[in-house]
């Protein structure tokens, strides 16, 4: 069923970033609906809709920006510690990453902020030189870490940025 939805461009699957095709399929998977109305129609009422809508819009923008490359460049990343980075863009065949993106509705809660930053920090230690960004609803700034700076950008600004 999911393959048919992808073939019809109704939704897209995101797999774990791995050099092994088998491992990437077994370790993690997220599905993103192209039409957020479809997401709301098919998800349980308990789902946090705004958070999921923001994550979906970030994924669709990453996919739009990367449409010139190979299919599958935008992945998710399960870290050895069990933490997860929402999106990683890179070359799976060579095990290199260029962008690490976390999506967070708000970082007002210190535990949420620490969770998002620690996941990116761990990923930055595995992929030196990768740009790290946390996309939020309306917060901005920079967080300095031992592995480099993490940029915090509101979704509207991040979406409008010119990319190389």
Region roles according to the model:
Residues 85, 109-112, 141-145:
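Short active-site-adjacent structural elements
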Residues 137-164:
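Domain-level recognition of nuclease-like catalytic cores that cleave nucleotide substrates
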Residues 131-136:
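Short, hydrophobic beta-strand segments that form beta-sheet elements in well-ordered domains
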Residues 106-125:
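Mg2+/Mn2+-dependent nuclease catalytic core
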Residues 67-69, 121-129:
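Arginine/glycine-rich "motif VI" loop of SF2 helicases in the C-terminal RecA-like domain
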Residues 90, 97-109:
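Active-site ExK catalytic segment of metal-dependent nucleases
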């Amino acid at each position: 069923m999911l393959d048919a939805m992808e073939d019809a461009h109704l939704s897209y699957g995101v797999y774990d970033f791995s050099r092994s095709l088998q491992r990437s399929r077994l370790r993690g998977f997220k599905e993103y609906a192209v039409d957020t109305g479809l997401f709301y129609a098919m998800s349980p009422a308990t789902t946090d809709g705004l958070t999921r809508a923001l994550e979906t819009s970030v994924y669709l923008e990453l996919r739009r920006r990367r449409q010139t490359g190979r299919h599958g460049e935008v992945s998710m990343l399960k870290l050895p510690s069990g933490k997860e980075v929402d999106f990683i863009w890179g070359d799976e065949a060579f095990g290199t990453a260029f962008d690490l993106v976390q999506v967070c509705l708000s970082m007002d809660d210190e535990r949420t902020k620490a969770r998002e930053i620690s996941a990116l920090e761990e990923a930055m230690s595995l992929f030196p030189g990768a740009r790290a960004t946390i996309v939020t609803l309306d917060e901005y700034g920079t967080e300095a870490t031992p592995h480099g700076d993490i940029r915090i950008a509101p979704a509207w600004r991040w979406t409008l940025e010119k990319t190389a």
